Amino acid sequence: MILPRHVLLFLLLSAIASSAIERDVVVYGGTSAGVAAAIQVARMGKSVILIEPSQHVGGLTSGGLGMTDSGKREVIGGISREFYQRLQKHYGNDGAWRQQKREDYQYYKASDDAIWRFEPKIAEQTLRAMLAEARVEVVYGQRLNLESGVEMLSEVSTSGGRSRRSHAITEIIMESGERYSAKMFIDAGYEGDLMAKAGVTYTVGRESNSKYGETLNGVQTKNARSHQFDADVDPYMVPGDPASGLLPGLHGGDPGVEGEGDHRVQAYCFRMCLTDAPENRVPFPKPEGYDPMRYELYLRYINKGWRTIWGNHKAMPNRKTDTNNHGAFSTDNIGMNYAYPDGDYATRERIIKEHEVYQKGLFWFLCNDPRVPGDLQNKIRLWGLAKDEFVDNGNWPHQI
């Protein structure tokens, strides 16, 4: 039977579309760990492809977390140290300093071989340069199909009279239909989607002390010392009236039995890159869906004397910051992320948007609500988003 030409063309295109892209190693997730893994594979002479669902590499390293929790820096080596050494070389150039003089930045020392604080955009530029030098192929904007995106091969082998079943990923499929096969797959994403869909067991939430015979797991109210209210703040919608209900953001239930596990995970926030350089400062935006009532608890806390808004406001080069949560009420959107780890993409996007609205709204509130004390408001108005950071996302971090 002779098939019509258009049918043959369709079959040919279908075959091409369904064929997998083959590499020795596929790395899923362009976090800093994923970047390092892909570079190392390439340096070992193996073929590799790095798949990143967003349009950026670096994860939180290029997403605002410029204050490296480095501990004992003498033990940091390999590609990680190479990254920090390249940053040091960058900031050794006069042209790297635009909003301040190099000698005015206390965390840069010419005698050091590495620098541990950096601007988000410089982090991503550095990581992209390292990928390019290693000739790593990077695919952006491809997400794993969470329904049927992992194909497995199961085999039974016998050794010493004992049978053992092994499972291996043979291919992964993106939402776009793109397929990738490899001898080895590395999940370097924060969510662990590839790991989870491959059947690896994991835990979400807090494990109980009894799970592994430990003492610091689960509910730990007795050890809660940081980020606690240091003044009595009325929690009710109508002050003094329990019948009026709790203010937004409060949980009225019992925290749970000490040492018991639950579904709760550590709070999320965006690590904000702020600046007080007028020529590079963008005013805090008012988010769509802004509700000042969401910050009523904070206002009451402020009126009790709280003023340490910038308690975790770390200086980066060029008068920028890595601004993190500090205190009982801050940039963490506490309790609003429990569905994120096991959520589908729509659920996660909703949660991320809620966090963005909450965090943007917090700073809009502090800068613009007339009830905020003037001394505090004037200090916060000196700051804003950095105009030259996250330029494709309204100067807002692309990674939560």
Predicted regions: what is each one?
Residues 6-15:
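Bacterial N-terminal signal peptides
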Residues 41:
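Aromatic pocket-lining residues of Rossmann-like dinucleotide-binding sites
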